[in-house]
Amino acid sequence: MSIEKLKAALPEYAKDIKLNLSSITRSSVLDQEQLWGTLLASAAATRNPQVLADIGAEATDHLSAAARHAALGAAAIMGMNNVFYRGRGFLEGRYDDLRPGLRMNIIANPGIPKANFELWSFAVSAINGCSHCLVAHEHTLRTVGVDREAIFEALKAAAIVSGVAQALATIEALSPS
């Protein structure tokens, strides 16, 4: 299992992250598609090749091809949107009257239940640090009936995956060349 490979790669100082990674993969708050889509989208958002490869390999056992496509699509479209909306937000409303003019069709037609795509977009927005998108996706999730516990679990999953990526990047940076 690739999650096991990630856990084995984590150093002793990241023991808490290792334990959290074990716990989140056994989550009963999210269904399997929600959980593994969140983990996969979050892994893509970290931009860490090892994290994406290992989580991606295991996610294949839990996600349909459509869900895998949508999770990776959520990471890609949020990579664009998070930069745009976070940047526009820094400009104190001076550009809010202008139409973005960016294609975002996957948001309207993700090929999976809309709530799951929103959950994955929410998780990626947390990793990418876009408060505008995070709030907007949380509002949509609450509007379509996703409970607070599921939203919070997705936030935890994103945080854990981000922590795994940070720990592995630290190991790589400190390794002798």
Swiss-Prot record:
The keyword Transport does not apply. It is an enzyme of class 1 (oxidoreductase). Disulfide bonds join C130-C133. GO terms for cellular component: cytosol; plasma membrane. It comes from the Bacteria. Homotrimer. Identified in a complex with AhpC, DlaT and Lpd. Belongs to the AhpD family. HAMAP family: AhpD. This is Alkyl hydroperoxide reductase AhpD. It comes from Mycobacterium tuberculosis (strain ATCC 25618 / H37Rv).
